[in-house]
Amino acid sequence: MLKKTALALAVLIASFDAQAAEALRVAADPIPHAQILEYVQKLDPQLQLKIIEIPNGVNSNELLAHGDVDANYFQHLPYLHSQEQALGQKFTVAATVHIEPLGIYSHRHTSFAQVPDKGTVAVPNNVTNLSRALYLLQANGLITLKPGFNDPAKDQATPKDIAENPRHLKILEIESPQIPRALDDVDLAVINGNYALEAGLSPAKDALELEKAQGNPYANILVTTPKLQDDPRIKQLAKDLNSPEVAKFITEKYAGSVIPVAVE
């Protein structure tokens, strides 16, 4: 299935190339990234963008490494670093744009006090967001990590690093895009902001608790290759993404569920 999806995506990218050879090809998650890029396109019509919405299961960093796109906009810096190691590639951060606070959600409970002994908690199964979820659970008094796990950006935690789990919570590692579907089956679910939005949730209203924006190391970034980092189109897109107009758009459209770095 993924091979068919990747093939279809390759055909889509090729058709974009045929339509506009000079357009900047940017791979993006549908929400909020592609929506933000669409606003940029309206804001700056002289900057030609080909926004390629990436389906779940397709690695935008592989597309970038292979030259199928010129940039991508979907990830945070810790995840990018893990991808550079996994793919043996070096990428370049062109702009730091917004934060999508990770949130803890529940369809069963309205407060953490209601979570029972041996309750179930769904968390992302990729390394960086799994660690991020554990730090958020710790920040809300549900678990305690071992000494030495102090910096979420540097000290990546796994369930083996839980020192105290007073409610004997069962940590279930699930593919990030699938976690919203598990809400009815678990006591708590830790969901990335973009997947919460895609599922029709409002992080600012529906989450029991969100990550704090101040000092958050998980800001979403525009990424390109070292070869293209000085491309005028990349520089203009980075400038647009960090503009007051885009910050205002993000603030008004997402109402605290997505936070522009400019007003963090």
Question: Can you annotate each of these PLM segments?
Answer:
Residues 23, 27-52, 59, 63:
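Short, polar/charged alpha-helical segment
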